[in-house]
A protein has these predicted regions:
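C-type cytochrome heme c attachment motif
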Residues: 36-45, 64, 68-71, 96-100, ...
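Gly/Gly-Pro-rich "capping" loops immediately C-terminal to redox-active cysteine motifs
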Residues: 48-78, 84-90, 126, 142-168, ...
């Protein structure tokens, strides 16, 4: 009940922020491109594709999801020392400006893996993704939508961490959907899901 109430408070606050966002990501304030380069690029990459461990790729991410995460960091509801320190310097206009700019970053493909994906593990991962409704919420190509993050091309180590934190309750969400989705998934299955999602290629799945 406590977690549900907290989610409701977050949802209400984010709705207010979202209503003030511009209708199209292409209308992003160009000043935030420079601020992204100076504030965010060192960790997340100039093009939104990070090479640092446990650091998410931002390229291709949706503005509403981005503003949600910045809000959670700013309000201390999502824990990360570095991100919290940065987000606490942002006002509501900054949250909107950065999230709108992030949404303009084109998708940067993940580097080719050193070895071909393990076919059996990919099949297991796909079965788990179907069983636990990953495609139903995040889309057939895992590209997500405004309130649902893009997963395709995300770093495997970051996916592992995120899934583990949702399962443990450490990671908050806009809703309780993710916590419920992974509540009965074993740690080993979470690793298999992360392995699959990080290597998922929609066209390859259709062949």
């Amino acid at each position: 009940l406590k977690r549900a109430c907290a989610a409701a408070v977050v949802a209400a606050a984010l709705s207010t922020l979202a209503l003030a966002q511009k209708p199209a990501a292409s209308a992003a304030n160009p000043g935030y491109a420079q601020r992204f380069a100076s504030v965010c690029a060192a960790c997340h990459g100039a093009n939104g594709r990070s090479e640092l461990p446990l650091t998410p790729a931002l390229s291709g991410q949706h503005s509403f999801y981005a503003i949600t995460q910045l809000f959670l960091f700013r309000e201390g509801r999502r824990g990360h020392e570095g991100m919290t320190a940065i987000a606490k310097t942002m006002n509501d206009a900054d949250l909107r400006g950065f999230s709108e700019f992030i949404a303009t970053l084109p998708v940067v493909p993940a580097p080719a893996p050193a070895t071909p994906p393990d076919a059996a593990r990919m099949a297991n991962g796909q079965a788990l993704a179907q069983q636990h409704k990953c495609f139903a919420c995040h889309g057939a190509d895992l590209s997500g939508g405004q309130q649902v993050p893009r997963l395709a091309q995300q770093r495997e180590d970051y996916l592992q961490l995120t899934l583990q934190e949702f399962k443990s309750g450490k990671r908050p969400g806009y809703t309780m959907a993710m916590g419920e989705a992974v509540s009965r998934v074993t740690p080993e299955e979470l690793d298999t899901l992360a392995y699959f999602i990080a290597r998922f290629a929609p066209q390859a799945q259709k062949k």
